[in-house]
């Protein structure tokens, strides 16, 4: 669709967003446009009530989390702002506010903020490679920081792309990871972990002294990463899980 193509070109040329960020915007918008088509809605003439009904469908029919819904709305608003500026028309989606769901919405990162954070770790250094994997695993798998630092190398199955996790109440569960996570994991195991593992630890994530990385150590890593960004939010493992 021309409007979507023009918008993604704008994000690349004018906003200088990465391909990863642009793809996420595109997926959100295309999902919304598919919904419009299924419900016989002209996206250029969508009413405020129709926009609200779309949000309700995300919650009640697709059972999406509040953070996922919030970011989709943010992506679609950006799309309509672009259309408004270029077509000189007003669209009802501008007026849409996220319905309150009882609990306060967890804090999360926008796509461009995630992109900025992932650019910080230096992949030429063992600690930078490790930090990149920490970001990726918290973001892509949604595991808790306590679960992250408890992973042992033998808990990982690269063939099935799964990790055996010991969660709350010492209950074992399986977490799946994607190709991007697998690539970062392979890089860490091949290029970085051996250089950090001076104490012959079984744990996946190690500190600079060769010992097991702690939850506080992960928080310190995130704090240091944020010092090199223009983002004003306080980054926590919990925030990455909800992004």
Where are these predicted regions, by residue range?
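Conserved catalytic core of the tyrosine transesterase superfamily
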Residues: 1-243
